[in-house]
A protein has these predicted regions:
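Domain-level signature for soluble enzymes in the chorismate/prephenate branch of the shikimate pathway
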Residues: 1-260
């Protein structure tokens, strides 16, 4: 859907082994664009994507799109014979209640993606995958149960990533930063910059810096005014001296198709 919205023609899909690999391929110039999940309404932020973005602040977000997520249990044998369930860790977590009720003794095995899980279970009478109905058609699998996600309104926000110049105009801007010091009021001082400029923070998420226990990187989404303004540039200028590192992934349009 993101590809269609941005009118990307003659798209060639490149197989990758995980979300970090997807971002790395883009950063290394092996592809022109990448689509990654960033946040789920049930399980929260997708940590692999967040960590990969922090490693590649040169990338920019071109568009965001929220889509409804409905998982199916797919396999080649009957549900009664399933002893192993494969899927991406996020999908397994989003279906944990259903699995506990219907397959309490099945071993849950994480994979790099739901599509990879579907490929791995094809032909096995005792393995099943949590994936989309589309994956069933692509890999010749039967639909053993649908839907299997615990929350009916399950939604995921996806990002279209590109290399190149960042936009300063859009519905939302995404930033990530680390602070000079872990001290009382340091984070409050940084976030106060948004309030002082009348900007709404629609999301904040923290990830370990991976350097020291208790040291964090903060990911922030900021709602931007509809009318053109210097609000984003002014915010970044005010934040810069407060941060050890500040990554600006650009401003971009954001759409929600989960209600369609």
């Amino acid at each position: 859907v993101l590809i269609d919205q941005d009118a990307l023609n003659d798209v060639q899909l490149i197989p990758c082994t995980g979300l970090r690999s997807v971002v790395e391929q883009l950063a290394q110039g092996q592809c022109d664009a990448a689509v990654v999940p960033i946040e789920n309404s049930v399980e929260g932020g997708v940590t692999a994507t967040l960590d990969a973005l922090w490693s590649h602040p040169e990338l920019c977000i071109q568009r965001a799109l929220v889509l409804p997520i409905q998982h199916a249990l797919l396999g080649s044998g009957p549900l009664s014979r399933v002893t192993e369930v494969l899927s991406h860790p996020q999908a397994l977590a989003q279906c944990s209640g259903w699995l506990a009720q219907h397959l309490p003794d099945a071993l849950q095995l994480p994979t790099s993606s739901t599509a990879e899980a579907a490929r791995m279970v094809a032909g096995s009478p005792f393995r099943a995958a949590i994936a989309s109905k589309t994956a069933a058609r692509e890999h010749g699998l039967d639909e053993l149960a649908f839907p299997v996600n615990d929350v009916a309104g399950n939604r995921t926000r996806f990002l279209l990533l590109r290399r190149g110049e960042r936009s300063e105009h859009g519905d939302v801007a995404s930033l990530a930063f680390s602070l000079h010091r872990n001290a009382p009021g340091a984070l409050l001082e940084a976030l106060a910059c948004l309030a002082q400029r009348g900007l709404n923070m629609s999301r904040i998420e923290s990830r370990p810096s991976k350097r020291e226990l208790g040291e964090y990187v903060f990911f922030v989404d900021v709602d931007l005014p509809a009318a053109p303004s210097t609000a984003l540039a002014d915010l970044i200028a005010q934040l810069q001296p407060l941060c050890e590192h500040l990554a600006h992934f650009g401003a971009y349009p954001s759409s929600d198709l989960s209600g369609c």
